[in-house]
Amino acid sequence: MTSRQSKTNLKNTYGSGKGEPEEDYITPGPFELERLFWKGSPQYTHVNEVWPKLYIGDEATALDRYSLEKSGFTHVLNAAHGRWNVNTGPEYYRDMAIEYHGVEADDLPTFNLSEFFYSAAEFIESALQSDRSKILVHCAMGRSRSATLVLAYLMIYRNMTVVDAIEQVAKNRCVLPNRGFLKQLRELDKQLLLQRRNAQSNEEENLEEKEI
């Protein structure tokens, strides 16, 4: 599946989605979001678990078929799919029990990665439905493109704000999406915030009608 445009398993303590954001929550600006990454994990290794069964890694991790199989990975999301990036694809894993999804993205502030947020998030969520699944989301360095897609997933499916998502990922891996990707995550945050507040408002109105 493709959308155009020796490893150590680390044990981490995970937070949970914080549900509905506070009423006075406002999406921070790009600089404020960047500062959140500075407070995160200083370690940079080939691959890190950032959420249960969800890992962010680099090109070396994705190319190491032996370690992937030994570690039990069942899904791979390549955020740098393509001939001039990390050129793997379904054929690279054809004799392995791995489901592949590729996103052909460039690590440039001008690249519109947001058009892949929902399809990538859906692939991750589908993978995590099985207790036996383990998914690697990678790009070349495992810092920008892959991290951005994982952040979007946590926001879409785990009801996190962009701040919650960054704190969750950054405490487990040294990542830093480019400024353009951060702006796209800000827009996603504002869209999701509006949707959730509207949904909450509708629920409250329905409850009031039932009480009358």
Swiss-Prot record:
Keywords: Cytoplasm, Hydrolase, Nucleus, Protein phosphatase. This is Dual specificity phosphatase 29. Dual specificity phosphatase able to dephosphorylate phosphotyrosine, phosphoserine and phosphothreonine residues, with a preference for phosphotyrosine as a substrate. The active site is at 139 (phosphocysteine intermediate). Its EC number is 3.1.3.16, 3.1.3.48. Homodimer. PROSITE patterns: TYR_PHOSPHATASE_1 (PS00383), TYR_PHOSPHATASE_2 (PS50056), TYR_PHOSPHATASE_DUAL (PS50054). Residues 1-15 have a biased composition (Polar residues). GO terms for biological process: negative regulation of MAPK cascade; protein dephosphorylation. Belongs to the protein-tyrosine phosphatase family. Non-receptor class dual specificity subfamily. Substrate binds at residues 138-145. One of its GO terms (cellular component) is cytoplasm. Gene3D superfamilies: Protein tyrosine phosphatase superfamily. It comes from the Eukaryota. GO terms for molecular function: MAP kinase phosphatase activity; protein serine/threonine phosphatase activity; protein tyrosine phosphatase activity; protein tyrosine/serine/threonine phosphatase activity.
